[in-house]
Amino acid sequence: MCICHVCKRPTFLDHQGSQHPGAPFGAPVGDVPEASVSQLYEEARRATAAGAYTAAVLCCRMLLMHIVVAKGAAENQTFLAYVEFLANKSYVPPEAAEWIDHIRKRGNEANHEISISPRTDAEDLVAFCEMLLRVIYEFPARAKRRGGGLSGAT
């Protein structure tokens, strides 16, 4: 047993060299004002680290719903309506629409079918959600702290 140098909590390596509990997948994202959004993202990160990949995929699906409602969409819409809201309000670049649709499809599979989500799906979706949170929350907050723009911008 060891003590993690980051969180200062106990951790151990099993006979295969795997760390338990594992470090959360992805990186923390700052400046997210909605507690539910931040909590769901962290839950998806921890679920991925724990090998609970289907749970992580479902968290990412729910996370997108929370983001969209926080940004002004009506509650109790279809997931497709939420995906379209993100695209129509330019919260994601056109090239990212394919990723949003990927989350929709993987989330639907995990939510409505008898299936198990693989590690790759969970990691891809958490990484996409991390990027989305940075674009929607973290980078605008950074710019605001710097006085509304980045230094050297013309």
How would you describe each model-predicted region?
Residues 1-53:
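Charged alpha-helical initiation segments
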